[in-house]
Amino acid sequence: MPTITDYELFAVPPRLLYLRLETDEGIVGWGEPTGGGHSSIVRTAIEALMENFVVGEDALAIEDHWQQLYYGGFFHGGPILMSAISGIDQALYDIKGKHYDLPVYELLGGKARDRLRVSQFIGGDQSLDATDIAADVVDAGVTAVKANAASRIRFIDTPAKVETIADDLAALRSTVGDDVDLAVDLHGRVSRSMAPRICEALETLDPAFVEEPIHPEYNDYLPELRSQTTVPLATGERVYTPNSFRRMLERGGVDVVQPSVSRAGGITGVDRIGQLAAAHDTSLAPHSPTGPVAYAASLHVGSSAPQTLFQQQPLDALEGHGRNIFDDLTVGDPFTFEDGFASVPDGPGLGVEVDEAELRERSQTDAGFRFPVWRHEDGSVARW
């Protein structure tokens, strides 16, 4: 059996974190946890888990590793620990696929679909500057787009604020047309009081879904909100464990779950969440605004899950809109995009060859990313 012998971590600006595992047979596996604004903390968590549980152990025993990393401590769950587990889990799957010369989707039971429809994130914070990008991506064949819609918003805000949000989205709908799915991200910025008003104002635009219509800490109120609107509701970017998704699905109120392969327990975690979603007739739309390793892992899970709606694609993976992080950090062209769909890499493991020289050149101890702090007119902190 191949044994894990070594690991390295690389933080790449603006907010990417990569984990490299190596076995005694020379197989290298890559994982991509997410540091967000806390990459140094996630890094420390990974180091602790690797030293205490993984180095020197069987590289193929993925399920045992997952259970040990998750249940082996008295405290489990949360964004830091689950991000650390996610990166390790991805890298172990990459190793196992390479060991058996199989793509990861074959380790998950095989593909249920040949390709995944892409949902292209197009920005939209503060003021909606996304219409030009939307036009570009639709011209390129994309059939689903997602935009942020609410910037700073009070707990109880004015009719004019609601109207501005609706008008901005109406401009986007006019740009993309009715043959394109338009998803709206409220980013958890909206209070319970404002969410029904905004969802009602958006109903005539027929969005694919409204993402994080309320802050995830208040997801218990999603069934109440769902009963007040015809708009499908989505959440999951900031839900971290399969059991947390199970409780949310059992309560109802969510139409689309959006676990991140870099936050919700890696491939193992998101695979479980996808099965739970299918058992509740709920769609899966994996959330992956990160780099090529996580994107590949997400495609593998999404290709084998029963009810995948589409795969989110980050803005900086889009040609012509800044550096293409997929091209920057990979060798060759692991992803093919055609007619609004992404191919699933079919090489061994995750099917992505990381450009180690480029990665080492760009890596830092801490990527240095910090989320912005927004404030209301009175000086109080607003939700970003």
Predicted regions mapped to residue ranges:
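Glycine-rich, aromatic-flanked loop segments that form ligand/cofactor-binding clefts
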Residues: 89-125, 129
